[in-house]
Amino acid sequence: MSMIPRLLRRMAAVLAGLALLLVALAVSYRWVPPPGSPLMAIRLAQGAPGIDRRWVPLDAISPHLVAAVVASEDSRFCTHHGIDWDAVEAARDHNEAGGRLRGASTLSMQTAKNAFLWPDRTWLRKGAELGFTLLIEATWPKRRIAEVYLNLAEWGDGIFGAEAAARRHFGKPAADLSAQEAALLAAVLPNPRRWSPERPTAYIRNRAATIERRMAIVRRDGLAACILDPA
């Protein structure tokens, strides 16, 4: 009988060690670029011929793309601490009213998912995402969260990060993206393997136009100031 408590203690020690290792890894990414992401490995396993991913510092990414992503994905990024409770409440009310299912994922949550987790909708994955979100919000500055997000986001089959996306879709570095190009890239983020910024459908063109209008609000109200103009 004494073997069971001993086994449980060993399992607890292993789990605690694994948790500490993951925390140390997450904290290290404040300074060290992630070498890849679980989704990149999944895409390779699914048969992608390769991964086009070129890490660049945030200063080498057009401010237009920063504004576009904030406008389309998380307009309160600079003011929340990982979870946008207003968006959560709005999504709940919308879904309860019978509208098309809407999420409330913030840029911080998407960064946590992209850097550490697999694409899934299980409660286990969601719980892990919440934990990593709170961890990076506590240990990374907002500017770093945005930098990692923009370098890990998927923008097409085997295309990851703003630099690879800009070069593959528009033939230019991410630093030179125009406002219109940035809006198109942001417009396809919900499903970048289905939609293309190079050959936008009418829906994507309309979505990009809406994002461009919101980008003006982002600039006017300083909604991306924590990324573009940190104190």
Curated annotation (Swiss-Prot):
It catalyses: [GlcNAc-(1->4)-Mur2Ac(oyl-L-Ala-gamma-D-Glu-L-Lys-D-Ala-D-Ala)](n)-di-trans,octa-cis-undecaprenyl diphosphate + beta-D-GlcNAc-(1->4)-Mur2Ac(oyl-L-Ala-gamma-D-Glu-L-Lys-D-Ala-D-Ala)-di-trans,octa-cis-undecaprenyl diphosphate = [GlcNAc-(1->4)-Mur2Ac(oyl-L-Ala-gamma-D-Glu-L-Lys-D-Ala-D-Ala)](n+1)-di-trans,octa-cis-undecaprenyl diphosphate + di-trans,octa-cis-undecaprenyl diphosphate + H(+). The chain crosses the membrane at residues 12-34. The keyword Transmembrane applies. One of its GO terms (biological process) is peptidoglycan biosynthetic process. It is an enzyme of class 2 (transferase). It is a single-pass membrane protein. Its EC number is 2.4.99.28. It is found in: Cell inner membrane. It comes from the Bacteria. GO terms for cellular component: peptidoglycan-based cell wall; plasma membrane. InterPro entries: Glyco_trans_51, Lysozyme-like_dom_sf, PBP_transglycosylase, Pep_trsgly. Keywords: Cell inner membrane, Cell membrane, Cell shape, Cell wall biogenesis/degradation, Glycosyltransferase, Membrane, Peptidoglycan synthesis, Transferase, Transmembrane, Transmembrane helix. Signal peptide: none annotated. Pathway: Cell wall biogenesis; peptidoglycan biosynthesis. GO terms for molecular function: pentosyltransferase activity; peptidoglycan glycosyltransferase activity. The keyword Cell inner membrane applies. Gene3D superfamilies: Biosynthetic peptidoglycan transglycosylase-like. Belongs to the glycosyltransferase 51 family. Peptidoglycan polymerase that catalyzes glycan chain elongation from lipid-linked precursors. This is Biosynthetic peptidoglycan transglycosylase. It comes from Rhodospirillum centenum (strain ATCC 51521 / SW). The gene is mtgA.
